[in-house]
Amino acid sequence: MPYRISRQAYAETYGPTTGDRIRLADTELILEVEKDYTVYGDEVKFGGGKVIRDGMGQAQTPRSEGAVDTVITNALILDWWGIVKADVGLRDGRIVAIGKAGNPDTQEGVTIVVGPGTEAIAGEGQILTAGGIDSHIHFICPQQIETALASGVTTMLGGGTGPATGTNATTCTPGAFHIGRMLQAAEGLPVNLGFFGKGNASTPEALEEQVRAGACGLKLHEDWGTTPAAIDACLSVADQMDVQVCIHTDTLNEAGFVEDTIAAIKGRTIHTFHTEGAGGGHAPDIIKICGEANVLPSSTNPTRPYTRNTLEEHLDMLMVCHHLDPKIPEDVAFAESRIRRETIAAEDILHDLGAFSIIASDSQAMGRVGEVITRTFQTAHKMKVQRGALPEDSSRNDNHRIKRYIAKVTINPALAHGISRDVGSIETGKLADLVLWKPGFFGIRPELVIKGGSIVWAQMGDANASIPTPGPVHGRPMFGAFGKALAPSCLTFLSAAAMDADIPKHLGLERTCRAVSDTRSVGKSALKLNSALPNVSVDPQTYEVFADGELLTCEPAEVLPLAQRYLLL
């Protein structure tokens, strides 16, 4: 007969259920469970004396008849589409079901069959998110990949060839030779990868060559000359070959102003990097481009969020990254023109309004590759404290704000770069790139990272201990990151033209390669929970930013969550 237990006891046993609320780490963000797929009384849980045992919660069903490879039990899913409690079934490295796991012969409502061939991961009391996507990577050193993975990022898009001077400044992998070498290097790296070719050319031939060689996109960067002619040529090739174009515009306004760049774009889809401008772009008003319907605007994390240290650290970072000389007054003036407290403050608010849609790192080129998710939720916290609840949220929770911010580092970069059919959300059919977080460490330290259905990273104790938990406990790579397990668990994204040219075979690639698609039809309206189109203007004298006539300003944060409380530095 049924046995009633208290809500607290239930949460401690099976994790929170509908109506329960959770604080995200040490932030002011409160999450509330919207739905629970569990059938009360028929929950599954692994362990001695628990449910997933032969003839109880485990059926006799073999894998060949539909039992899943892995079940994540009682996880609290946080995604752009909802905050729900569910079991998640994985097969062949993909998500096959979100619902109720167990044995259909003994339990009600089973949609995920647990069999003798099923592994169990306990999701009770933990938050499950899609693996993060960082779409602004300078591939300066391979050690970035481990650092990103340790933060919950499982997909990295960008450009570079290592610590070359060009790569230190620009996210471009220029030319067929370098693209080929980077695609080969990707074979040993346990994340999904894609590389941008250099988009700075006024004629199409060299751009087409790079796309055919395997570039999944093209990057226009001012350090290579982002002129109206280059913008037009690059976008024309992108439209023809279905790849995304990313742009870092002309800070010095040498070849034109922001209005000239908008005119050169001609209404075509484009991903604007560090759209506020401290990372580069038309001074002082590149930020206004976020109001264009064809523009997919992103930030990089050096300015996320605006704090009392933001301005001070930027000048030195900028001088190093862009190969500037502090002894040359013009170089110093160039750097100083990009750093404006008014536009950085406005950037916080534009993110909170959903007018800026994506957050990425700018790894080792002013940004920190291991802090994308951390900085995203620090921004959300700061805005909750300074602006209060969003109109869409209730007095009980911050669900809409939390979903808006998780979308910035998951589904929206996936949509922008034509990879959303494989990654970016927890939905059936997608690659099982998943991150489990203890709520007290959400956004700062994942408990477990799953890549293509295999565990690639986890918090792990002393390997010589008698159990897995004795200290020192820290993140370490797991079996999924080694040997031939790596290739089938990871994707390399190429252009369709490169796939047609059989580039994977020509380069001897063993990883699964996928063509990006539908990059030219995506507009800002397609970006989840971040599609606002305010009319933005900047006062050229004071740099004050206005959206639909309203001044956007906020104070710098003095103290942040997800910081020194968690990091012994």
Curated annotation (Swiss-Prot):
Q: What is its EC number?
A: 3.5.1.5
Reactions performed catalytically = urea + 2 H2O + H(+) = hydrogencarbonate + 2 NH4(+)
Swiss-Prot/TrEMBL cofactor(s): Ni cation
Identify the SUPFAM superfamilies for this entry. Composite domain of metallo-dependent hydrolases, Metallo-dependent hydrolases
**Lineage top rank: taxon:** Bacteria
Chain positions recorded as Ni(2+) 1 binding sites: 136, 138, 219, 362
What does the entry's cofactor note say about binding and number? Binds 2 nickel ions per subunit.
Question: Where is the protein situated, by its record's location annotation?
Answer: Cytoplasm
Q: Which UniProt keywords apply?
A: Cytoplasm, Hydrolase, Metal-binding, Nickel
Which Pfam families does this one have? Amidohydro_1 (PF01979), Urease_alpha (PF00449)
* Post-translational note: Carboxylation allows a single lysine to coordinate two nickel ions.
Q: GO cellular component annotations, sorted alphabetically?
A: cytoplasm
Q: Which residue ranges does the record assign to the Urease domain?
A: 131-569
Q: What class of enzyme is it?
A: hydrolase
Q: List the disulfide bonds.
A: none
Name its pathway.
Nitrogen metabolism; urea degradation; CO(2) and NH(3) from urea (urease route): step 1/1
Positions annotated as active site in the UniProt record: 322 (proton donor)
Gene Ontology biological-process entries: urea catabolic process
Q: Indicate the family of this protein.
A: Belongs to the metallo-dependent hydrolases superfamily. Urease alpha subunit family.
The subunit field of the Swiss-Prot or TrEMBL record says: Heterotrimer of UreA (gamma), UreB (beta) and UreC (alpha) subunits. Three heterotrimers associate to form the active enzyme.
Do you know which HAMAP family this protein is assigned to?
Urease_alpha (MF_01953)
Name of the featured protein: Urease subunit alpha
Originating gene: ureC
